[in-house]
């Protein structure tokens, strides 16, 4: 559905939005057909650390309806930090993950994922991060194209998240 993106609002979200994020994630799975490996199924426990510190959870609203969200996760030295898999990064704490971007099915095709990634990148750059990274399923060309459009390049192919094949993308920003 084509929409007037100028009527949408972007809001920083808090932990209280986790149920809405999970509902939107389930919407993505419901429209995935047989391809359920394209997205990692997050839980409240995997989302909770994404709030606070330098991390950012950014929602896009059409009125009161959450139509998209993006998560920049500054994971520090935890195992969730994708920089552990990047040979070029010597200090993993200088990396932030573009962890998750989901757009409600009816709102796809309006550039929302690309815009969310751009805003997450700008947030990381403003906070002095030197690297950004993200993983994408090889079955998800839309996300790959939106990362590439935001200056990311393919770093390597990995098996992550309990056996899912992922392409690791990275971007040097500072």
Regions found by a protein language model. Give the residues of each.
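Conserved GNAT acetyl-CoA-binding A-motif
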Residues: 124-136
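Conserved active-site alpha-helix within GNAT-family acetyltransferase domains
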Residues: 114, 126, 138-157
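Conserved acyl-donor/pantetheine-binding loop and adjacent beta-alpha core of acyl/acetyltransferases
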Residues: 69-100
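Active-site rim helix/loop that mediates acceptor-substrate recognition in acyltransferases
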Residues: 35-63, 71
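Conserved beta-strand-loop-alpha-helix junction that forms the acyl-donor binding cleft
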Residues: 108, 134-144, 162
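Helix-loop element at the rim of GNAT/NAT acetyltransferase active sites that forms part
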Residues: 23-40
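Conserved N-terminal entry element of GNAT/NAT acetyltransferase domains
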Residues: 1-19, 23, 27
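Conserved acetyl-CoA-binding loop-helix of GNAT-fold acetyltransferases
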Residues: 100-103, 109-122, 145, 149
